[in-house]
Amino acid sequence: MSGRLWCKATFAGYKRGLRNQREHTALLKIEGVYARDETEFYFGKRCAYVYKAKNNTVTPGGKPNRTRVIWGKVTRAHGNSGMVRAKFRSNLPAKAIGHRIRVMLYPSRI
């Protein structure tokens, strides 16, 4: 069995008020989640923004490649339509808005 261990999500933007945006919290739209009560399953799940950079870097136990990852965690729901808030180790870059975020199906809380 080799399937995906992650769900597809889209980085919709940063948490914001009318005039200020808070870049330390990202808003994610998870595919197939359309109500606030459905988001509870994803609380505490790890999420990752995977991207390609210009230069190779060495990963422990692997070959040098251009792939990089920013890790984060889903923290809570945002609104009533299935959006969630996530905090990343370093803030997501603005160029990531509209791009794919992987929401891992671990750690399990069941």
Swiss-Prot record:
UniProt GO BP: cytoplasmic translation; ribosomal large subunit biogenesis
Keyword Transmembrane: no
Annotated compartments: Cytoplasm
A Pfam family assignment: Ribosomal_L35Ae
Gene Ontology CC terms: cytosolic large ribosomal subunit
GO molecular function annotations of the record: structural constituent of ribosome; tRNA binding
Keywords: Cytoplasm, Ribonucleoprotein, Ribosomal protein, RNA-binding, tRNA-binding
Binding partners and assembly: Component of the large ribosomal subunit.
Biological role: Component of the large ribosomal subunit. The ribosome is a large ribonucleoprotein complex responsible for the synthesis of proteins in the cell.
Database matches in HAMAP family: Ribosomal_eL33
PANTHER family per record: 60S RIBOSOMAL PROTEIN L35A (PTHR10902)
Family, as annotated: Belongs to the eukaryotic ribosomal protein eL33 family.
Name assigned to this protein: Large ribosomal subunit protein eL33
Native source organism of the sequence: Xenopus laevis (African clawed frog)
